[in-house]
Amino acid sequence: MKISAILWDYDGTLVNSVKKNIEVTKEVLKNFIPDLDNNLPRALTSVENYEEANYKYKNWRELYKFAYGLTDEQIDEAGKLWSPYQLKDATLPDMFDKMDYVVNNLSNIKHGICSQNCSKNIYNTLKHYTIEKCFHSIIGYEDISYTEQKPNPKAFLKCVEKLDISLDNSILVYIGDHQEDTIFGKNAEEFYKSQGYNTKIICIAASYSGNTPNDWIVKPDFTAYSTTDILDIINKVLQKK
């Protein structure tokens, strides 16, 4: 079996976007929470609290419901505001150390992104760091219906479809910083198996962003404690194929 593609999460995996996402979230919530500055949800009071809430909930909809107190109808409206507010905020997130080196060293393999951020915002960041040509498919939250967000595998399937690769006797690698990313990858593997494909999905946890995969109920296949660990893991997988 060969590695046909490497799929990535974006926030907390390719880039450290926490500070930008906090500010964008505040702007979005001002449409729903009167006097937000005096009624700031705990999750937005610090980077640490934001990351704690982000890892606690399965996806952005749960985050907005339980951490910010929005109704389902308000969450739908907030979803429509995320892309324009992200694009309006010109702040560029920092790419994790040596990530451009890692991506360029794996450029012989097709790359895609499955994210709950907006695809245009992701592309703009990749272009700034001059690695946009390495990514052949970018699926953002707006490319998938609200009922099919992670860990539903729909975004994974759509991303792979755009990559136009062979699925049979193939290995797909998925890299993410959240337990739900691992579940997301395994859900996609189960779908491919149900369709008769001999497709193996290897899930790598991006622990360099600060999460603790040892505490996860659903464990990744590998853990990257630094970005360059990803290269070592890919080489290990290739040697076993």
What kind of feature is each model-predicted range?
Residues 92, 118-173, 179-193, 197:
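Substrate-recognition "cap/lid" segment bordering the active-site pocket of phosphatases
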Residues 174-225:
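Acidic, Mg2+-coordinating phosphoryl-transfer loop and its flanking beta/alpha structural elements
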Residues 13, 20, 119, 180, ...:
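Conserved Rossmann-like nucleotide-cofactor binding loop
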Residues 3-97, 101:
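N-terminal helical cap/lid subdomain that shapes the substrate entry/recognition surface
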Residues 24, 98, 121-124, 184, ...:
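Phosphate- and divalent-cation-binding pockets in alpha/beta enzyme and binding domains
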Residues 25, 102-127, 141:
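Substrate-recognition element of Asp-dependent hydrolases with the DxDx(T/V) motif
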Residues 131-142, 213-235:
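Structural recognition of alpha->loop->beta junctions
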Residues 20, 94-98, 117, 151, ...:
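Short beta->alpha linker loops
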